[in-house]
């Protein structure tokens, strides 16, 4: 519970290793349910991709966010991602640029652990993008891909979605084009 004392809690800055400001934004009591459910879902639906690359990690995390949205339909999408409304708006306004950035830098199908860590883990902003971008902006893209996939595949149940480990198949069948 000490992770949810509020973003302005003075104790976070007094620790031997202070909690960065960007991380404190997600340390409110409103984040408890999201974090608890995310933890539970990642244990229930383990990441076992056919190919361990960035796009697979993006879509896996997008699937977790999509399922969270189904469980908590009243919660704003940006809150489920740990973003502010402004950060989600930035992603919406720059969706095509995010996608182009991943393709032009050959990151989308990268299997390099440092690339996956850099883009899938929490950060003050997404490396290589403006400081206005949220950390993990590519996870928002994964969430959008899953949304497009489920929109096209109306017969796919949540159970089937979560069981699918061929993330390249989800990408292909989503027909995602920002």
Enumerate the predicted regions with their spans:
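A cross-kingdom marker for long, charged
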Residues: 55, 59-178
């Amino acid at each position: 519970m000490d992770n949810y004392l509020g973003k302005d809690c003075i104790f976070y800055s007094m620790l031997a290793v202070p909690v960065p400001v960007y991380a404190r934004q997600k340390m409110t009591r409103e984040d408890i349910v999201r974090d608890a459910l995310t933890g539970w879902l990642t244990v229930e639906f383990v990441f076992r991709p056919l190919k361990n690359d960035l796009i697979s990690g993006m879509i896996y995390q997008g699937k977790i966010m999509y399922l969270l949205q189904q469980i908590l339909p009243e919660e704003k999408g940006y809150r489920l991602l740990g973003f502010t409304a402004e950060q989600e708006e930035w992603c919406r306004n720059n969706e095509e640029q995010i996608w182009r950035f991943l393709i032009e830098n050959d990151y989308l199908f990268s299997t390099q652990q440092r690339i996956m860590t850099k883009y899938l883990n929490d950060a003050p902003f997404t490396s290589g993008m403006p400081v206005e971008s949220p950390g993990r902006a590519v996870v928002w893209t994964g969430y959008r891909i899953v949304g497009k996939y489920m929109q096209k595949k109306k017969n796919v149940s949540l159970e089937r979605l979560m069981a699918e480990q061929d993330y390249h198949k989800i990408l292909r069948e989503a027909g995602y084009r920002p």
